């Protein structure tokens, strides 16, 4: 993503990390591990001498100016001023802060705009109405069964024309046959899956049907803990990490009777699509990556290796692979789905959501994984109002006129807006202030660097496969130079942006935006609004696409003639109103008529 690549190149750098570990007076310089913090109370102190000249150089980064006397005072006193910070990291009373410990300040999207938080958030009513479509007869071809949406698979399993064990074996065979091309699976849970499938069949035969996910095989992004099954976060130094308990979402899916079949790939520590096993590829265009960081969920779902998957998003990690791989990606409202037992990248931004082959499937999964959990202080009880049979005519859909005229918008995006108009929605042009939205990423990078402070300072981050300017190792290191003042100002700006989005949603019921529009990826993730990415057509590409910054030494493949790949639009809804964007997405999906298309060769 452009915002990930560019932000720290242009971000202001803080004064805290320019300091080594010396007092104002001259001291001997000693060797130290790169990236290691100053040793509290050490003699001689670690690192180079900090002098008034150090602060003079730092002023260039911070765009501030001190007088000579102020520089002298800062150089003489900085160690005393920051002693408590250093002691927390390296002193005799140093304190380890577990990944599960969230900051004391908790982001609540509704509260940020002045809304009252009651016992339950969201719509006035709890409702879930499935479509009335008949699943039809069970196909004779295994591939046709594998690609069927959960909405159909669940009907076949409920009526016992299809067993969970047979369906599980179909997906296991497809993984064995196709995943060598995709590298979407980190850990195959074959024995676990077959045992769960047999249990599901036994329960259903006994009349103990748990609901539409009962017996349905799925995969989860490998940042969700699974009891006694390794959870690697896509990183080499975590490849043998085996949790003692399931993540809350995995436990909820287990309670729904779903069958965990695979732990799916993610870009290492949730960035892009390269993990310790290689790059996850796009089944529609195997010469390019699947995008990330929910690369495995996107690729495996698109290739019919699982019935559905669970991805995560911090700044585009559901939207982007859903677009690239041509699947449906639902990013829930921040706080709707508990993240207990999930890898933390950014406490105030991380979200978990379904990636499926259809809109109704996404809502079936969302219903199962929603809810509050004591382990996630940001999770809230929220009603879900979805009626697949309800009309969409009369709704107001906002759009940004300028964005629809320029890249990354395409004719497919513009046609989708016209389709909504034909379906009876009223298009309403909306605007946002011309603000530097990417500066919000101060919060993201500071939180991410805090989450991974230990591996940054002990050097393990250097073992990650991707060591380029826009990968986490460099970003974590650079984030040590961010200003605490800029972090607070970014957080305050976040509230202003949330108020602007609240203003827009007083005028419209939902937004339609080009999926990869950087400004809206940033804005909607920081404000916590839900999004639904729906495939509505195809585009032709002459070159493979990549999440990474261009590298002249490794040019991307080009194609003549151009290749046809999926393309979709993204709908953004009011806070906790996933039901409205799903209703509209379902109508748009039917109008487009491309959701059932499959990648050639899979």
Language-model region placement:
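Short glycine/serine-rich loop/turn segments
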Residues: 212-352, 400, 438, 446, ...
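Glycine-rich, small-residue loops and helix-cap segments
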Residues: 160, 215, 255, 259-262, ...
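N-terminal, positively charged, Ser/Thr/Ala/Gly-biased leader segments
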Residues: 182-233
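Acyltransferase
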Residues: 161, 166-172, 198, 408-431, ...
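Short helix-loop capping/hinge segments that flank enzyme active sites or metal/cofactor-binding pockets
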Residues: 128-143, 214-233, 391-400, 442-498, ...
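A short helix-breaking turn/cap at a secondary-structure junction
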Residues: 124, 131-136, 331-414, 458, ...
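An N-terminal boundary/leader segment
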Residues: 2-20, 24-195, 422-424, 480-481, ...
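Conserved hydrophobic/aromatic pocket- or pore-lining residues that grip, position, or stack substrates
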Residues: 171, 193, 215, 221, ...
